[in-house]
């Protein structure tokens, strides 16, 4: 990953509201493939993922389907149970000392002209996370000033409704490298499951007014971004 030695940034950080909630940490890296280089980037991301997993790291790589940048965007995520575990990650960069296979990969990645870094940040989970192979839809919100707790409570209410229709929901808080954002992550085991859940949600009379509160009235803050990604097998 380009300049990974310098940009290992935490996607979610702890705050006054995460105490008692945090169940995991994620480091997130966005990359964009250059025209004609998508297949090369796919192979490069898979190679790094396989090295990381073989070393015991919980790593998932995704390709974006919908969102800014379209199918040229790629997402690399490292998951950790704690900051102590993160400090002992499989391809440790403490003192710039790497495992040999990871160092070779870093050199290959940084010399590649197939992609460019877009963003990196850290997150902290605010509930139990559901790592796995899913179709992933993400909505990132910026709570109104002084109303973080209100937005989080509304998001937790929404989670109950969505999970009642078959979605798995993860809630994260952005940290270092990003803003004070809340991220609502909708996980589906397949396209068919996603379609079934979405249709049920459209017909849910409890959700209809809450959807207006979020999107039309902007009662809980500003929508920062939304996108869909799927795992690179």
Functional labels for PLM-detected ranges:
Residues 4-15:
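Sec-dependent N-terminal signal peptides
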Residues 21-233:
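Short S/T/G/P-rich N-terminal loop/turn motif that feeds into the first structured element of a domain
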Residues 2-3, 219:
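Short alpha-helical segments used as structural interaction elements across diverse proteins
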